[in-house]
A protein has these predicted regions:
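ABC-type ATPase nucleotide-binding domains, specifically the catalytic core motifs of the NBD
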Residues: 17, 73, 98-117, 125-130, ...
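The feature captures the beta-strand-to-loop junction immediately N-terminal to the Walker
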Residues: 38-40
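Helix-to-loop junction immediately C-terminal to a conserved catalytic motif
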Residues: 53
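Conserved ABC transporter NBD signature motif
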Residues: 61-70, 81, 114-119, 219-221
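Conserved ABC ATPase signature
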Residues: 136-140, 144
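ABC ATPase C-loop
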Residues: 153-154
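Conserved catalytic motifs of ABC-family nucleotide-binding domains
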Residues: 157
Length: 238
């Protein structure tokens, strides 16, 4: 039986005024996979996620989620279809409590009636969020804020989450804990696209990987068959 394609990006170009950020990018993500998008700063990784989530508009190409076109849709419609973004830099609402930040994530018609049930699941995954639920989010540590950003994305009951640089600025022990939770999330049936600069960790977590360089896909494949030399050449453009 063929794998179900959750996300299909075909021939994507994205411009910011006169600057072209993505050039004919195509990727496929099967349902249930963890797919890693790797590249240095400026490679176009965040642009790819932002365009998939509806925050940016492509100038060419298509994006399909479970067979339906989602390119050019506003972000709230993309979320309602089952795609959630964990943005770079966490972007929690600083003067709202942990609970209020999570509450905001459950605004879709599907998730609203089950808000308390979903909250319980998030609290099981990240017990510290339950402990600090009445605390202002700007008083949390960086790792706790990242847990909150992931929890908020999960409140809409997504089928796919797009994680943008979730290890940025965090201590290795905290990163290890967050990646452990990501494995649990994936084992619960949620497909994950993971954007990272950390080559080793992201390849270890993924079933499949794409490497971007200057807005183009320069290498793709299963991490287990990618050689260190291939990855270095693709990442650094050697």
């Amino acid at each position: 039986m063929a794998d179900t394609v959750a996300l299909k990006v075909s021939g994507l170009d994205v411009h910011y005024k006169d600057f072209q950020a993505l050039w004919d990018v195509s990727i496929e993500v099967n349902a249930g996979q963890v797919v890693s998008i790797i590249g240095a700063n400026g490679a176009g990784k965040s642009t790819l996620l932002n365009t998939t989530s509806g925050l940016s508009t492509p100038t060419k190409g298509t994006i399909e989620f479970l067979g339906d076109r989602i390119d050019g849709q506003p972000p709230h419609e993309t979320v309602a279809r089952g795609v959630s973004l964990v943005p770079e830099g966490r972007r929690v609402f600083p003067r709202l409590t942990v609970y209020e930040n999570l509450f905001i994530g459950s605004y879709t018609p599907k998730s609203r009636p089950k808000r308390e049930q979903i909250l319980g699941t998030i609290y099981e995954l990240f017990p510290v969020l339950k402990e600090r639920r009445n605390q202002m989010s700007d008083t949390l540590s960086g790792g706790e804020q990242q847990m909150l950003a992931i929890g908020r994305a999960l409140m809409s009951e997504p089928k796919l989450i797009l994680c943008d640089e979730i290890s940025l600025g965090l201590a290795p022990v905290i990163i290890a804990g967050i990646y452990k939770r990501l494995r649990q999330i994936n084992e619960d049936g949620i497909t994950i696209v993971l954007v990272e600069q950390d080559i080793t960790r992201s390849l270890k977590a993924a079933n499949y990987a794409y490497i971007l360089l200057e807005g183009k896909v320069v290498l793709e494949g299963e991490p287990s068959v990618m050689t260190e030399e291939q990855v270095k050449k693709a990442y650094f453009g050697m």
